[in-house]
Amino acid sequence: MKKIKIGICGWGTVATALHRSILENKNQIKRTHQVDLEIVAIGARRDNPKYSAGKTKVLRNIFDVLDEDIDVLVELIGGTDDAKTLISSSFEKKIPVVTANKAVIYEYGDILFREASNNGVDFLFEASVCAGTPTINLLKNDLAGNKFLSIKGMLNGTSNFIISQMEDGMSFEDSLSFAQENGYAEADPTFDIEGIDAAHKISILSNIVFGSPLPPNEFLIEGISNITKQDIYIAEKLDFTVKHVSSADMKDGKLLIRSNPALVQKSDYLSSLKNVRNGLVIDTDLIGKIHISGSGAGGEATAAGVISDIVRLASESSNHNATSKEDLKYRQISDELFSFLIIVNSSSENINSDVLDMLAEHNISIRNSGLILSLIHI
């Protein structure tokens, strides 16, 4: 049986859930995976009033964890610069790293992948996208041999939770407050509601699937803060749902990445995912479309992804390190043709005939949703 000694840096929601999960599931992991997990030390600048480390050694200087007898460092401090320095220091000491920190991968991914490779250690980050839902390993290993055509999905549980509440009649502001009260949104929700968190995640997936650099070239990032109850109502009338969708697809040898609100037909798989569910549709040449979904928020779900990476270190095929393509070409969002919706506070009888003729010439159909006229480009 292989023993793995763990050092954890960070002592927030995910770190405490990880500590608890390892202690509670230690015997099961031994039995099913033949791996003995031992938490040697925790790097925490302050105590967590909601959870005690018990008998585990706590070090106030997080970098001191690297001086302990550990086989893997779990980086859960969040942020970018300090996290990058910590991870790089771990690589220099030939200690592999597991992280759930999508921000540091987005900002420094290419540098960290190179450092891990140069030092001959693993850098695993399953929990950085879709928490504990198996995503990174699926793309890196299980789908080897497939050519990826596109990947799209809902990658932020907070945004999906808020939109789900709005579908039930709540305003955006009330939905956000409700999400915060239930622990699904941070006190400062900017990263979630402005699409930044989802943009980080689709960038990581695009790096794995298409080799795009980290950080990536500039692409469309838009959040949900401007969505109104009226938007939700109109979408419902037109047999759509509003979702925050992030995607990366290759067409004619050029890549397009985007992360923005979109109308999704009710018959679409993504439309069925509610509350904090994350979901992905992966399109490949050999086996077609693959649908996956799971909880995208919460300490326990994220801890599950971290544990899967730690256990994977005991195997021979644990490396998640990715490589960017230097000659990758991009498509611009301004060059793309999309269906779109324009809402006009009027009835068709009140619109000038010249306007109607112009719309017809450009294949823009007019549908009346009942109270508000909507225009859909098809």
Question: What role is predicted for each listed range?
Answer:
Residues 1-92:
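N-terminal glycine-/serine-/threonine-rich beta1-alpha1-beta2 phosphate-ribose binding loop
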Residues 84, 102-126:
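Rossmann-fold NAD(P)-binding glycine/threonine-rich loop
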Residues 117-120, 124-197, 204:
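Rossmann-like NAD(P)H-binding beta-loop-alpha module
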Residues 165, 176-272, 277-279:
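Substrate-binding/catalytic subdomain of NAD(P)-dependent oxidoreductase enzymes
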Residues 333-346:
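Short glycine-/aliphatic-rich beta-strand segments at the starts of folded cytosolic domains
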Residues 376-378:
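Conserved small/polar residues in nucleotide/adenosyl-binding loops
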